[in-house]
């Protein structure tokens, strides 16, 4: 394990790199120094901004040959193509929902099995404690 000698004074989370601590501190300050030039939305990390900018992509070059639906990304088309397979269904054993891919079912199953972290200020719940902490900063 790496030596985690950089500790946050707000929550005591430790990091092996000073740069990671500095990036982490933005969670506590609420600062979002990386802004989208398309819509103005702010992000704590440049990486998050880059991921967001892809949502503004206008061309949809990937076309389903079965129904004509278009996608910005090849993985979106590939996922969609599974919905055209006959008799390929993945039912949830906990409720009545049916999914066209095992990946979608697996994501859904987390709602039945994972521990949740409720916000004490509103009715939102989160699957990860870190997401609850981030959310609580808005209250």
From Swiss-Prot:
Q: Which UniProt keywords apply?
A: DNA-binding, Metal-binding, Nucleus, Repeat, Transcription, Transcription regulation, Zinc, Zinc-finger
InterPro entries, per the entry: C2H2-ZF_domain-containing, Znf_C2H2_sf, Znf_C2H2_type
Q: Name one GO cellular component term.
A: nucleus
This protein's record includes keyword Cytoplasm: no
Pfam name, any one: zf-C2H2
Q: What is the protein's major site of localization?
A: nucleus
Where are the C2H2-type Zn fingers located?
6-28, 34-56, 62-84, 90-112, 117-139
Instruction: Read off the PROSITE patterns from this record.
Output: ZINC_FINGER_C2H2_1 (PS00028), ZINC_FINGER_C2H2_2 (PS50157)
Molecular function via GO = DNA binding; zinc ion binding
Reading the lineage from the top rank, the first entry is Eukaryota
Per UniProt, subcellular location reads as: Nucleus
Q: What does this protein do?
A: May be involved in transcriptional regulation.
Q: Which family does it belong to?
A: Belongs to the krueppel C2H2-type zinc-finger protein family.
Q: What's this protein's name?
A: Gastrula zinc finger protein XlCGF29.1
């Amino acid at each position: 394990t790496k030596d985690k000698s950089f500790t946050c004074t707000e929550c005591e989370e430790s990091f092996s790199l000073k740069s990671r601590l500095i990036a982490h501190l933005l969670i506590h300050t609420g600062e979002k120094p990386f802004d989208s030039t398309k819509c103005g939305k702010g992000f704590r990390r440049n990486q998050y901004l880059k991921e967001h900018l892809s949502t503004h992509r206008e061309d949809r070059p990937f076309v389903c040959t079965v129904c004509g639906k278009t996608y910005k990304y090849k993985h979106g088309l590939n996922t969609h193509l599974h919905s055209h397979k006959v008799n390929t269904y993945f039912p949830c054993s906990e409720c009545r929902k049916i999914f066209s891919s095992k990946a979608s079912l697996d994501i859904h199953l987390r709602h039945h099995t994972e521990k949740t972290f409720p916000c004490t200020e509103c009715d939102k719940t989160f699957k990860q404690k870190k997401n609850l902490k981030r959310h609580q900063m808005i209250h």
